[in-house]
């Protein structure tokens, strides 16, 4: 039996989906335990290219059971759209290989609307939300103002619960934002079209996972986003509204006794960021555009150009510590092949002093990157599958990162396809 978490070390978009898709060959169950439809996990395999926002990335493996845990922001509309897209490419999805926790809270129609209304109100002070309703959803969850997926089996009680929530929510929608109020007819339409359609997948997933654990199954826990977007440990308030750490896996999955055997932290070979907030190493102009195009750095959910920069050792080391990673997968090393020399941020300059410690969020806006340049390899490495076949300069780059973030790099990704990987 093995329990493994796949987590992001930086701002998200590190390549968690492609690593889950690769490593699930050795696992029986994959669990998404937090987050919602606000970030995408890109997977390229024999079925095609996919950007998964809610479906666990193990959905392409025939013998893997995929679970959406109680910690997930369950967006029925987006989930059904993903199921259609994936099954349309020949992937089989049934209640046997996709299970939704009866204790997962439903993302309701007003959550997405309120997200957009608040971003519009904030104007130039906005957080850069993907407008998928995540912050309003989690706010309501902690106010106990959401609907559990299990309530879908009790339509009469559910409608009464929704009516109470609607009356309360309309005070905000109309009273604060001046937007049109919701009606029960609108909610009935939403239930008929989306809510009830996911009922076949809803079950006691915590009970299922306990049985899987007791029978010696290998279970993988797939996180969304990364350490620097964690609600408690990220760059607050430019975070997501859930905990993106491996430590949340027991709570968000329903396996309270869970002990993780390994925590694989995913690190991109350079830095990217979607959304607002301090980004110490940010590149601009032509230099940034070259890197963005080389790495196809556009948001999987929004299509927005990602902010890009050199690898930030200070932020990455902090992310490794937050996640307590046991090993690292370094992704997109091949993207840097066009550079003659490769910049790396080794320290920050803050108030005239050098530091290699990640500062408190308030201070980050004043931090400046201290860069060191490494020799590039200036060639295509996407066909290489053995560590010793990499150019010496590429190996030097990887070992430098390994030594300075304090965690062994076991996997080196040299392309987006499943087999474009070097295992050390």
Where are the predicted features?
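Non-transmembrane, aqueous-exposed alpha-helical and coiled segments at domain scale
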Residues: 1-424
